[in-house]
From Swiss-Prot:
Keywords associated with the record: Chloroplast, Plastid, Ribonucleoprotein, Ribosomal protein
Family annotation (SUPFAM superfamilies): Ribosomal protein S5 domain 2-like (SSF54211)
Subcellular location: Plastid, Chloroplast
GO cellular component terms given for this protein: chloroplast; small ribosomal subunit
Superkingdom per UniProt: Eukaryota
Similarity comment: family membership: Belongs to the universal ribosomal protein uS9 family.
Protein's name according to its UniProt entry: Small ribosomal subunit protein uS9c
GO biological process, alphabetically ordered: translation
Organism phylogeny: Eukaryota, Viridiplantae, Chlorophyta, core chlorophytes, Chlorophyceae
Alphabetized InterPro entries for the sequence: Ribosomal_Su5_D2-typ_SF, Ribosomal_uS9, Ribosomal_uS9_bac/plastid, Ribosomal_uS9_CS, Ribsml_uS5_D2-typ_fold_subgr
GO-annotated molecular function: RNA binding; structural constituent of ribosome
PANTHER family: RIBOSOMAL PROTEIN S9, SMALL RIBOSOMAL SUBUNIT PROTEIN US9M
PROSITE patterns with a match to the protein in the record: RIBOSOMAL_S9 (PS00360)
């Protein structure tokens, strides 16, 4: 039986080189990243797992809640680029944006907690005449 999956909300998050596309679906509370469960994809890293669950915890939403409540959302994520920490932070921003699209009342709580603020720090470009972004070749006085 193929059931049509209805996307309830979408969100895109970026951090460093990582880009995460997040979709919220009605379901059983699964968190899938690139086809794998979140714990498996993030290699059981507690910092990354806490980061991606933080927007849900802020709203007191539990993935394993009752079947008849609003809290049974499947979160499907496609993420590419960057490292594991950058990807986790991109997912966190994408989830927060998707939750805001899903229910506008969540926006104030997420905004006050800083989940909707994108971290704008990226790698600085290399300049000509220098070895790296700021590292200059050794200076010879004579």
């Amino acid at each position: 039986m193929s059931q049509k999956l209805y996307i309830l909300a979408k969100g895109i998050g970026r951090r460093k080189e990582a880009v995460a596309q997040v979709q919220l679906l009605a379901g059983s509370g699964q968190f899938i990243i690139n086809g794998l469960p979140a714990n498996l994809y993030l290699q059981e890293d507690p910092r990354s797992i806490l980061a991606i669950d933080a927007p849900f915890k802020q709203l007191h939403v539990d993935h394993s809640a009752d079947k008849d409540s609003l809290q049974t959302l499947d979160t499907i994520v496609k993420v590419q680029g960057g490292g594991k920490i950058g990807q986790a932070n991109a997912i966190k921003l994408g989830v927060a944006r998707a939750l805001c699209e899903f229910n506008g009342e969540y926006r104030k709580s997420l905004k006050d907690s800083g989940f909707l603020t994108q971290d704008s720090r990226i790698k600085e470009r290399r300049k000509y005449g220098l070895k790296k972004a700021r590292k200059a070749p050794q200076y010879h006085k004579r």
